[in-house]
A protein has these predicted regions:
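Short alpha-helical Gxxx[C/S/T] motif in the catalytic ATP-binding
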Residues: 132-137
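Detector for a conserved hydrophobic position within an alpha-helical segment of the HATPase_c
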Residues: 140-141
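Conserved catalytic submotifs in the C-terminal HATPase_c
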Residues: 35-50
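Glycine-rich ATP-binding loops of the HATPase_c
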Residues: 144-151
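Acidic ATP/Mg2+-coordinating residue in the GHKL
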Residues: 102
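Short helix N-cap motif at coil->helix boundaries in the Bergerat
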Residues: 13, 106-114, 128
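Short beta-strand-loop-beta element adjacent to the nucleotide/active-site pocket used for signaling
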Residues: 80-98
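A conserved beta-strand-to-alpha-helix junction within the catalytic ATP-binding
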Residues: 9-22, 42
Length: 172
């Protein structure tokens, strides 16, 4: 594995999140059972949040994976409520945090404990490799010296939080 990414540069968190929304909304794969256009997107951005020094392509990949997972989980749950993804940015000490929260089926403690393990998946055979979240975990924790966490309970939706050092400071 390589060390710190060579493509670290300042980027506004809000711009990264908006790029992810744009990428997700143009993802019309008929094999997928969801239409991103049917999902309500709620934006809750902290206007005082400064730039992150990151590899924005890698962080976009992480967030896109989280957004797609949320969309898929909500569609497979057959919710009676309007599917909603809330994208929230906030500062936590020396970190800029991005939350991807859905109002989907949620997950139990066992699933939450295993969700970042390689090859662990809750998706149907053939529709997921179980690598997305383990790769995301590596990108956030190893490449960016940040943290990624999940909080969820069955029937209550899921929230993934990605926290990255502000100003390029290492979290080591």
């Amino acid at each position: 594995s390589r060390g710190a990414s060579a493509d670290m540069e300042p980027a506004r968190i809000e711009d990264i999140v908006e790029t992810v929304v744009r990428l997700a909304s143009t993802d019309y794969d008929l094999k997928k059972k969801y239409d991103f256009r049917q999902i309500e997107i709620v934006r809750d951005y902290d206007p005082g949040l400064e730039t992150l020094v990151c590899d924005h392509t890698e962080i976009e990949q992480v967030l896109l994976n989280l957004v797609k997972n949320a969309a898929q989980a909500m569609s497979e749950a057959g919710l009676s409520r309007t599917p909603r993804i809330t994208l929230r940015t906030r500062r936590a000490g020396e970190y800029g945090c991005i939350e991807v929260e859905d109002n989907g089926p949620g997950m139990d403690e066992h699933t939450q404990r295993r969700v970042f393990e390689p090859f662990f998946t809750t998706k149907a055979v053939g529709s997921g490799t179980g690598l997305g979240l383990s790769v995301s975990y590596f990108i956030v924790t190893e490449q960016h010296k940040g943290a990624i966490d999940v909080s969820s309970s069955p029937g209550e939706g899921t929230c993934f939080t990605v926290c990255l050092p502000l100003g390029g400071k290492s979290a080591r």
